[in-house]
Structures are given as C-alpha cells and as structure tokens.
C-alpha cells in the first residue's frame, strides 16, 4: 500500500501542528458510498454526506465517517463525553453549550497538506431547536424533554472516507494525532487504522433476510389541546403573518 505522507515526511510535518492527515488512495470502481457505508456502520455512530449541486446534479465528493474519536451529547444541565474506548465522563453544561465543542476543536492544530479534499475530519453533528434559548434568552426553555434528546450531538471524527467522483478515487484519511504520544506511535496508529478500514471494505457483504411485521399499537393517540384551542392558535398565527412578524410557525 502506498500511504502518504511517508514516515520521514510525517516527522517534518508534525513540527507544524499536532494533527497530520495520513491517507491511502484506492480505485473506486467497485465501491460506492452506500456499499462502503454498509461495511463501516457497525463501528459506532456514522455519517454520510453527499454533495449535491442543485436539483439532481451530484457534486464531486461524498464523505463517510465512523468510529469517532469522541462523542459529545450535550443536555440542558450536563454533557456526556464518550471516548473511543467507550469510557464516559459527565461535565456540567456551560451557558453556551457550543463552548464545549469549540474548546475540543481548539486543542487540535491541523497541518495543511496541499491537494486534500475540502473536508477531512472534524466535528459532525446537529444542534437541536432548544439551543435557541442559549442565543436568545427571552425564548423560554421547554419544561419537558420526553424523548430525552440532547441539545447538541457531535462526533469528533479523525477518520474519513472520501469518494472523489471526478477522479473515481476513494481516499481513506486518518489523522495521526500527537497528543502526548511519540511521533512513531502516532504514525503507526494511523497506518493501522487505515489497514483496518481497508480490511472492512474488502469483506464481502452478506444480505440478511428481513421480515416485516405488523406494528403492535397498545395505546390510543391523545391530543394535548382541544380543537377549539388549536383553531384559535391558527387564527393567531395568521394575524402574525399578516403583520409581517413571522413567515411560518410550527404549532
């Protein structure tokens, strides 16, 4: 396998930061983003980004990630940080929940290598509706969270599979991180992860039989407001729209 940069090149690059992308290019004639995703998705939380340029035009890149370095699940009063070894730590949630993600990303000093795709790793996730309270404090916090969803959910990913549709190349990119380890260990760890991903991609897919079952419904749907209250709320929203205060509202 032709892995870049070489060990000697890496020793020079790591002097400019603490995170160097190590990569291997493969011909992508027998693999698609979906087939690759199906092979790596068992490695913990995953993501697949498809590039679309208007309508049905597919853009140049597809990005896949799995086996994140860290996972941040931020709730209103606490944050659960899960490491790659599945160990967990709970910390209080600051007034600005994004501060946790910003501090995490500030700990990395990535080394730029010319010719790399526009995305090779970082923070991938979502911001929930409830986050607006951290920006506009006049917006009240929901009194309940029945689904127990986090306000923020982010994967810190240092391993990314990049499909270059223009060149028909699949690039496996893993960052060598010098976070207290020596350069040789960091480089070898990244190379080993690349080799592990290659082995996953070379594993034949087995299609499993899936039988559909009728869902069991053991409850009766109940509304939380009456029809009269709902109609009144709709009329109020119409007034807001006519006044130019809103363009749409979710009731």
Listing of model-derived features with the role each one plays in the protein:
Residues 94:
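Active-site metal-coordination/substrate-binding segment of hydrolases
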Residues 1-41, 45-46, 51-91, 129-251:
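Extended accessory regions or peripheral subdomains of proteins
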Residues 97-114, 137-148:
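Short acidic (Asp/Glu) patches
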Residues 102-116, 227-239:
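Short, hydrophobic/aliphatic alpha-helical segments
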């Amino acid at each position: 396998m032709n892995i870049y940069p070489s060990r000697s090149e890496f020793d020079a690059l790591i002097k400019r930061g603490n995170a160097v992308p190590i990569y291997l290019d493969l011909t992508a004639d027998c693999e698609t983003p979906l087939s690759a995703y199906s092979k790596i998705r068992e490695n913990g939380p995953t993501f697949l980004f498809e590039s679309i340029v208007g309508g049905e035009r597919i853009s140049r890149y597809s990005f896949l990630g799995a086996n994140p370095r860290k996972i941040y699940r931020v709730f209103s009063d606490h944050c659960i940080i899960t490491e790659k070894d599945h160990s967990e730590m709970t910390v209080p949630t600051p007034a600005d929940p994004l501060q946790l993600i910003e501090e995490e990303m500030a700990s990395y000093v990535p080394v730029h290598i010319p010719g790399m795709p526009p995305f090779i790793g970082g923070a991938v996730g979502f911001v929930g509706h409830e986050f607006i309270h951290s920006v506009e404090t006049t917006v009240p916090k929901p009194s309940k969270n029945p689904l127990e969803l986090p306000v923020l959910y982010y994967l810190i990913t240092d391993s990314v599979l990049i499909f270059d549709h223009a060149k028909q190349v699949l690039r496996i990119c893993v960052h060598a991180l010098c976070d207290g380890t020596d350069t040789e260990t960091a480089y070898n760890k990244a190379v080993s992860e690349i080799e592990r991903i290659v082995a996953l991609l070379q594993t034949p897919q087995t299609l499993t039989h899936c039988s559909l079952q009728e869902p069991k419904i053991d409850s009766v749907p109940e509304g939380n407001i009456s029809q009269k209250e709902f109609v009144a709320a709709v009329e109020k929203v119409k007034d807001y729209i006519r006044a130019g205060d809103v363009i749409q509202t979710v009731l």
